[in-house]
Amino acid sequence: NMKLTKINYNILVYLPDDIETMKGQNILADDFNMGAFSVTVLENMNAKDILKLEDKIRDIDGVAKVITGYDALGTEIPASILPTDIRSKLSKDNNDIMLITYNDATSADTTLNAVTKVREITKDACKVGGMSAMLLDTMDLAQREITIYIVIAVVLCILVLELSLNSYLVPILLMLNIGMAILYNLGTNLVFGEISYITKALVAVLQLGVTTDFSIFLYHSYESKKDKYKTKEEAMTEAISETFISVLGSSLTTIAGFLVLCTMKLTLGKDLGLVMAKGVLLGVITTLTVFPVLLLYFDNAIEKTKHKSLLPKFTHLNNFVIKNHKIIFTLFIKIGRASCRE
C-alpha cells in the first residue's frame, strides 16, 4: 500500500483557488492551452547546434513548443545586429535562453518525464529551470534524505531511552512497536489516494515524537504491577487498562490538534492533519496490542538486560521546585508578560 500511495510533489495544488496565483494559472491553462514551461540556459553553443537541439527536444513526448531567438534569426544572421537591450535578454556571455512549453500541467507525469529526457539529451550543455524541474529536484532530494534523518531520529531516540529506561532491550522493542505503527500509517494513506511529499517527509519523525510516551507509560505501569500479581499476564492486563485510561485524554487532544489543521485554507494542513491524526490513533492501538505482546514474549530477556538508571534522580531539583514554587510561579508570570510586550 505504501508503494501504491501517490506522492504529490506539486505544492501549488494545495493553494486555494481564489488567490491570484491560481487564477493566473487557470487562465493560462483554460484560455491559452498553456501547460508547464521550462526556461533553459544553453552554454557555449552555436546557432546551428541550438537549432538541432530544438528539433531533438520537439520530438520528446509531452513537449508542445521550443523557442529560441534563432528561430527568427536563423543561422545566417548574427545576433550581434540586434539592439543591445533585446540581445541581452536572449544571449549573454555565450549563454542563450531556450523556452520549452509542455502539453500538460507542471506536476503531470508526462511533463516530468519530458523534463527528464530534456536533461538526458542536453546533459551538461544546458541548465533546465522552472517549476517542473524544481519538482524533479525536490523528488530526488526528498527520496535520498528521508531515510537518512529517520535513521538519525531512531538512533537518537534509542540512545535517550537507553539512558532513561532500566533495560537495554526495552528501547529496541519500543522502536519496533512504533515502527510498526508508522508502517501501518504510511500504508493506510492509500485511502486518501495521495499525500504531499512534505507529509511523507514529516510523518515518521512526528509520529515517533508524539507517540513514544504511550509505550513508555505502559512499560512503567507493567513493571510496577509485576510484584503485585501472581502472573505477568495479570500484571499486563492491569497495565493495559491503566495505560488506556491515562493516554486516552492526551491522545485525543493530540488528535484534535492535528485535525484543527484541516481548517487551513492551505489544504496542505488537511493533508498533514489527517495523516498525523491517524498516526496517533494507530500509535495508541499498537501500544495497547502489539507492545504488550513484545514485552511478555521477551520478558526473560528484558530481566537479563536490566541495569541501573543512568540518569540522575534530580532530587535536589525536585526539592528546590517544591520549596520555591511561589517564586517560580511569579517569575513565570513576569517572563510571560515581558514576552507579550515584545
What kind of region is each of these model predictions?
Residues 1-9, 13, 106-341:
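Membrane-embedded transmembrane helical bundles of large multi-pass transporters/channels
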Residues 15-18, 22-23, 47-101, 136-140:
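Extracytoplasmic
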Residues 35-39, 95-97, 203:
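Short, solvent-exposed beta-strand edge segments and adjacent coil->beta transition regions
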